[in-house]
């Protein structure tokens, strides 16, 4: 037994190191080296070992990322050094004033600045001892924050163990919610009739202060680190012992990256103030291209010795300033207010606006969320309104310019019947959402089909909203399973669907039968079940029938599946109509199992490295990647001597030329089909 335990201990530590390495490649460097399926196998092996030998479980094990039971509150934590706020600069003049103050305090010295993006999130502190995360906290009042260690452990970019055993290190960073995750979260909350988050920052803050870590884990947060509050770096970082600490802030950022932290790559060093100012002003427009929200840039004196001499006021350091972007708003007119019916029956009022340019795009619509918000803001048809993008993402009406009213404006009220089917509408107690009561409502059906066919679900090319509207109107489709019964003669008469398009659509529908179980679960449109939850459920149950028979008690014990998701799943599969649709899908031949090769860890392409270049005729880039990974292969973004195959479509790029130079096997699309068995 002792030998078994020792072997298990060695293997568990080996697995932890390997998983930590792949977390670093994926979440920090954005260079994954293995497939999701291969990563899941490593995690499952570690979970089995720790379950068999509970004494092996460590606080830094990757299996401990999702916390246990909800807590009653958060304990207070005192920071090792104050987490000060930053003084603000709102224009070029104030930036130059900051530089003047720095140079006056450091007469005759050369000053270099580091400029970093100011992430719009929640400031947090992470404390490590001997390379192990022991505590994480919010900023709080700067001296004392709240202990949110268990919640921060669920953020995949937070290392539980550093790549080197640094004796003591307090790291500062910004937790945030990516724009895409924020949009998905609010869409789900709107469908559920829940209060929406105003912006990604509020969403991140609310997510990290959840008493239940499983809810935090489901929110897909991320974190960039930007500095340290305290550091005993030791010989783990400086092995020669000639110095014991970094000397520049830019060096700190590089060291943090080497230790396993995610550092924002958009930082620059400047010697000349004019270039620094130009760089800051240039980000005002560029920020909208980023996948996360930023509200400015932070300018810091690079030399740590100079930082120490400059010191700080009671509120903020003298060696740093935050350049804040001016809020981008525009005035436009509400032309009309119309109601959209979602796939769960929620009636969402939307303002039709006179088109206006805002935050890099033309805005012609803005969601008004629900009737309560319209009443609260007193929004009327014909009003001139101030609009902005919440978190630079979602257009919203900020305020009504009531002084501009002429008397011709019209008040608006939520219709008492569904605008699509005429059925009655209801508003559940405690909810802001109004819902259509008709399960067979054409608008609900249409939105559900759009979701089912979408790229992240069953990915049926050519089946867009216009075609779906015609199919529903003609009575050809009453649920998603009916798509698989469509015939050529059903499609040809439809507008804009000639013989060729009809054949292509039928082929796309047929191809979708082979999509993964995770995609099918997501496509079903179960309330609160997003892409990540669908993958977790697929990996856990391995079959749709297994998920259908799951109890609520069983579901809540799955990491990241909380009570709300569990209740929604049980409710969905308890519905007789839903079960009939699934039965039709099974009879049509739609895949309801996980890939056997993924489950058993093998496949005809096992271990082979592929690079994709050019445009494939019959595969999207994502489809080709999923096919390769399902057969055991993996995708690389660049060609090297370790590459086994380059799949070349039309107009291949430089990767094709490099493959020729290195003698790497090049496959055209037909050869790729033969290799993967998709003839």
Swiss-Prot record:
Domain of life the protein comes from: Bacteria
UniProt name for this protein: DNA ligase
Keyword Disulfide bond tagged: no
Gene that this sequence comes from: ligA
Enzyme Commission identifier(s): 6.5.1.2
Organism: Pelotomaculum thermopropionicum (strain DSM 13744 / JCM 10971 / SI)
Catalysed transformations (reactions): NAD(+) + (deoxyribonucleotide)n-3'-hydroxyl + 5'-phospho-(deoxyribonucleotide)m = (deoxyribonucleotide)n+m + AMP + beta-nicotinamide D-nucleotide
The organism's taxonomic lineage, starting at the top: Bacteria, Bacillati, Bacillota, Clostridia, Eubacteriales
CDD domains hit by this protein: BRCT_DNA_ligase_like, LIGANc
SMART domains associated with the record: BRCT, HhH1, LIGANc
Family statement: Belongs to the NAD-dependent DNA ligase family. LigA subfamily.
Keywords of this entry: DNA damage, DNA repair, DNA replication, Ligase, Magnesium, Manganese, Metal-binding, NAD, Zinc
One annotated GO biological process: DNA repair
HAMAP family according to UniProt: DNA_ligase_A
NCBIfam families membership: dnlj, PRK07956.1
Cofactor: Mg(2+); Mn(2+)
InterPro entries: BRCT_dom (IPR001357), BRCT_dom_sf (IPR036420), DisA/LigA_HHH (IPR041663), DNA_ligase (IPR001679), DNA_ligase_AS (IPR018239), DNA_ligase_CS (IPR033136), DNAligase_adenylation (IPR013839), DNAligase_N (IPR013840)
Catalytic residues in the record: 118
Binding site for NAD(+): 36-40, 85-86, 116, 139, 174, 300, 324
């Amino acid at each position: 037994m002792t030998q078994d335990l020792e072997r298990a201990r060695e293997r568990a530590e080996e697995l932890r190191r390997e998983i930590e390495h792949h977390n670093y490649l994926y979440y920090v460097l954005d260079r994954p080296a293995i497939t999701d399926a291969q990563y899941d196998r490593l995690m499952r092996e570690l979970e089995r070992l720790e379950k068999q030998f509970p004494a092996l479980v460590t606080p830094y094990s990757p299996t401990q990322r999702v916390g246990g039971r909800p807590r009653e509150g958060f304990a207070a934590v005192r920071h090792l050094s104050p987490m000060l706020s930053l003084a603000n600069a709102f224009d070029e003049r104030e930036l130059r004033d900051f530089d003047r103050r720095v140079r006056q305090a450091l007469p005759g010295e050369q000053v270099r600045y580091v400029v970093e993006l100011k992430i719009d999130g929640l400031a947090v502190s992470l404390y490590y001892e001997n390379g192990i995360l022991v505590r994480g906290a919010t900023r709080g009042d700067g001296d004392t924050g709240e202990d949110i260690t268990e919640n921060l452990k669920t953020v995949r970019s937070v290392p539980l163990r550093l790549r080197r055993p640094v004796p003591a290190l307090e790291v500062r960073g910004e937790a945030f919610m990516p724009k895409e995750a924020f949009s998905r979260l609010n869409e789900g909350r709107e469908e559920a009739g829940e209060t929406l988050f105003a912006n990604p920052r509020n969403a991140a803050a609310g997510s990290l202060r959840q008493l239940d870590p499983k809810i935090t884990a489901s929110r897909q947060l991320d974190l960039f680190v930007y500095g340290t509050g305290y550091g005993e770096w030791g010989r783990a970082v400086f092995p020669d012992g000639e110095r014991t600490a970094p000397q520049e802030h830019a060096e700190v950022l590089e060291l943090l990256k080497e230790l396993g932290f995610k550092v924002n790559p958009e930082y620059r060093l400047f010697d000349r103030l004019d270039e620094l100012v130009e760089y800051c002003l240039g980000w005002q427009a560029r920020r909208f291209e980023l996948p996360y929200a930023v509200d400015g840039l932070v300018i810091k004196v690079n030399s740590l010795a100079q930082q120490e001499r400059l010191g700080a006021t009671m509120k903020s350091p003298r060696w740093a300033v935050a350049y804040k972007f001016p809020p981008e708003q525009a005035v436009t007119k509400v032309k009309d207010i119309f109601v959209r019916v979602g796939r769960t029956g929620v009636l969402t009022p939307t303002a039709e606006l006179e088109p206006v340019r805002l935050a890099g795009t033309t805005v012609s619509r803005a969601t008004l969320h629900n009737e309560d918000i319209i009443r609260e803001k007193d929004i009327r048809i014909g009003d001139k309104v101030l609009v902005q993008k919440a978190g630079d993402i979602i257009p919203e009406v900020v305020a009504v310019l009531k002084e501009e009213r002429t008397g011709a404006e019209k008040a608006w009220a939520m219709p008492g019947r569904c605008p699509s089917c005429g059925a009655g509408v209801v508003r559940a107690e405690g909810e802001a959402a109004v819902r259509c009561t008709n399960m067979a409502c054409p608008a609900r059906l249409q939105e559900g089909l759009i979701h089912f066919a979408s790229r992240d679900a069953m990915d049926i090319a050519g089946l867009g909203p216009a075609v779906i509207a015609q199919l529903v109107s003609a009575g050809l489709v009453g649920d998603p399973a009916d798509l698989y019964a469509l015939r050529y003669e059903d499609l040809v008469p439809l507008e804009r669907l000639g013989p060729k398009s009809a054949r292509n659509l039928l082929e796309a529908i047929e191809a979708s039968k082979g999509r993964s179980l995770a995609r099918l679960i997501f496509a079903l449109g179960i309330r609160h079940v997003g892409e990540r939850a669908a993958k977790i459920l697929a990996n856990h149950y391995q079959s749709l029938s297994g998920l259908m028979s799951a109890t609520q008690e069983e579901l809540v014990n799955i990491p990241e599946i909380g009570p709300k998701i569990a209740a929604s799943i049980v409710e969905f599969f308890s519905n007789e109509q839903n079960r009939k649709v699934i039965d039709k899908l099974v009879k049509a031949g739609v895949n309801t199992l996980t890939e056997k090769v993924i489950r058993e860890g093998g496949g005809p392409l096992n271990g082979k490295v592929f690079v994709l270049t050019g445009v494939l005729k019959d595969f999207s880039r994502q489809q080709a990647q999923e096919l390769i990974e399902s057969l055991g292969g993996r995708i690389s973004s660049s060609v090297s001597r370790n590459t086994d195959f380059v799949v070349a479509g039309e107009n291949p790029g430089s990767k094709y030329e490099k493959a020729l130079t290195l003698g790497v096997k090049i496959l055209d699309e037909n050869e790729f089909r033969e290799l993967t068995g998709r003839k």
